[in-house]
Each structure stands twice: as C-alpha cells, then as structure tokens.
C-alpha cells in the first residue's frame, strides 16, 4: 500500500542559504531534504537483546528497524514507510561510518535492513550505493563483505591524508568556501578555502540515507548525524581541526551540511546506537569507553537527532563521573582544548532542524 504523504505531515520547505564567504552548489530540490518530512521528531527504539555475547543479534535489530521507521512516519506498515521516501528508479546512497573500527562503526545488520527496506520500496540492489570517503577505511571495516549481491560500493579517494586538497573523486562545481585554511597555506588561494563535495553525491545518487554512530569526538564534541555528513562528503576537512587549539568544527560542520546538494538529497537518518563511545572519539581506544546502549534512532531532522544523541552521551558521562561534553577539558584520551558541540545549535539556527528541546517530539520505544 502506498500512503499519501499529505496524510502524515504538513511538508516544510526552506531555501538553503550561503554561509560566511559563500558556497556553490545545487541539488535536486524537494520536500524530502533536511530537515525533512518530520522536523523535530526523533524515534528511539531500545532492545536489550540487540547486542549480546559480544555479537549483534539480527532478529532484535530487525524488529527495531521495522518499529522505528513505522513510528517515525506514521505509516501503516514497514513497506508503506519506505515508500514514503523512496520509489523505483531512485539511486540511493548510504553513508556509513567506518571510523573507530572495530569498536563503533555502522553495523552490518542495520545496513542490511536498510537495504531490505529500499528493496520493498522498489529500489533494486544495483541502485543502492554504500559509501565512505576513504577506500582503505571502507575495506578495513569490512563493509564490502556485508553487502547483498548487486549492491554497489563507492568512495572518494584511496586513503586519509593530512592535506586533502586533491580533486580526484570530488566535484569542482559543488563546494563550500570559508575563510579558513591550515597553517602555512595561502589564505588568498580559493582552492585551500574550499571543501568540494564527493562526486558520489553530486553525480551518482539522487537520495541519501545517513547511517552515523553514537560517539564522542575530541574536536566536534559529538560525532552523530551532522558530522557524518560534513566530514564524510567533502574534502579539505582537516582545516576544521588542524590542531588541538586550532578548531573550527563549530561553524564548519553546519556550513557544509547547509550546502544545497547535501541538504536536499539527504532524506533519512538512522543513528546506530546499539554500541556507543562516550569519550576518546572518534577513533577506538581498545574498548575503554565503549558501552552497549542497545538503541537505534530514526529521524529526518539531524539537529533534533544530534541534540538527542548529545544528551545520551552526557548522561553516560555523568554516570561515569565525567563532565558534560561541552565542559570537558583535555586529558590523555581527548586532546583538544575546547571541543565544539555547539555545531548542533548553529545548524539549528541555519534551519537544518529543531534545536529547542521543548519543540522536539521524542518517541521512546522499548521492545525488551
């Protein structure tokens, strides 16, 4: 059954604006883009059996996925929910997160359930593309081993480098420009002031699903939905956190996500919080700050989602006797002088979603 979208929600539209020194980008304008069909709505689904004995458990995760997407949309069933966002002929990208492997990455079971949902909406496997920036990180995490037959994989470049100004895999027609460079670069050179969007997004897919994880981040404070987009879809991101004291994540992250091609093509966020990392992120610390949270989060609004995830991380830190993320100071596992989770609030001010807790509609489900 295909559900009339108008029966679920009054759709919002917003014109994407340039930020700071401007941007050049365009996307296929549509009402599905950020903040999406359900601004301010965040559905969390908990199941204590989703990770047991050190392993992800398929059946509980499948139940969580089905309940979460239905409750997010208000659709009568799993198939109708997916058809609200996707249809036959769409080419859909899935932005995974391999950073922090093997501790906290987008898990195979959630990824495969997303692909199953796309299939129900009429999207064939050949029209699904799973992506991360770096080929080597993608392969080291093992994503290629998890994909159903026919699903494609993609990346922008071979591996991480500290300069990130190469254009292979990036689109010269889509970029965010701001007056921010790495030390020693010519600040008058437009190329070093720009971050270009991956061709994966600009040329190869027409819709994007964001599959972030639940983690602390030394420079950004938290790495959730917004940062998975900003630092996974463009180049020249090292300038946003060049050193422990030269940190501009607070403004860089929302500036990138505000690019029309990102904002308009990103239609759904599924935050994998089955495992979380409450300190020492983004990389692993041999499981030192790892915990089983057993929860998936569903949203079309990355700001409301990240505000929720940030509060989850702060609650876990409080349980461990640690200060909130925004007040944290450098230590042996987190070296930045001042992390910048305020990127979430700034994104809200740009119209990328709902920041105010009083306006966030949190729907909390416990399946066992």
Where are these regions (language model features)?
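Extended, low-polarity segments enriched in aliphatic/aromatic residues
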Residues: 27-88, 99-101, 105-112, 120-368
């Amino acid at each position: 059954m295909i559900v009339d979208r108008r029966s679920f929600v009054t759709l919002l539209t917003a014109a994407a604006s340039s930020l700071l020194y401007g941007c050049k980008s365009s996307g296929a304008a549509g009402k599905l883009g950020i903040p999406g069909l359900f601004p301010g709505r965040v559905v969390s689904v908990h199941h204590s059996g989703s990770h047991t004995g050190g392993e992800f458990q398929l059946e509980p995760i499948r139940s969580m996925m089905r309940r979460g997407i239905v409750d997010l949309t208000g659709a009568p069933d799993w198939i109708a929910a997916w058809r609200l966002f996707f249809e036959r002929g769409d080419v859909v990208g899935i932005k995974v997160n391999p950073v922090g492997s093997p501790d906290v990455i987008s898990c195979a079971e959630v990824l495969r359930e997303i692909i199953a949902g796309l299939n129900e909406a009429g999207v064939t496997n050949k029209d699904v593309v799973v992506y991360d920036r770096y080929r080597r990180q993608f392969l080291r995490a093992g994503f290629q081993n998890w994909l159903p037959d026919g699903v494609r994989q993609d990346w922008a470049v071979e591996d991480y480098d500290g300069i990130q100004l190469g254009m292979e895999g990036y689109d010269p027609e889509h970029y965010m420009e701001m007056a921010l460079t790495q030390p020693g670069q010519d600040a008058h050179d437009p190329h070093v002031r720009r971050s270009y969007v991956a061709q994966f997004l600009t040329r190869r897919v027409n819709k994007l699903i964001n599959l972030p994880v639940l983690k602390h981040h030394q420079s950004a404070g938290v790495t959730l939905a917004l940062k998975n987009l900003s630092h996974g879809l463009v180049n020249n991101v090292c300038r946003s956190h060049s050193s422990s004291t030269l940190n501009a994540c607070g403004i860089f992250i929302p500036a990138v996500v505000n690019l029309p091609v990102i904002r308009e093509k990103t239609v759904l966020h599924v935050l994998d919080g089955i495992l979380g990392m409450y300190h020492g992120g983004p990389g692993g610390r041999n499981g030192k700050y790892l915990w089983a949270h057993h929860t998936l989060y569903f949203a079309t609004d990355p700001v409301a989602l990240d505000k929720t995830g940030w509060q989850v991380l702060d609650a876990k830190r409080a349980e461990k006797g640690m200060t909130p993320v925004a007040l944290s100071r450098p230590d042996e596992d987190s070296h930045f002088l001042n992390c910048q989770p305020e990127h979430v609030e700034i994104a809200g001010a740009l119209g990328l979603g709902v920041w105010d807790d009083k306006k966030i509609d949190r729907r909390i489900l416990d399946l066992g």
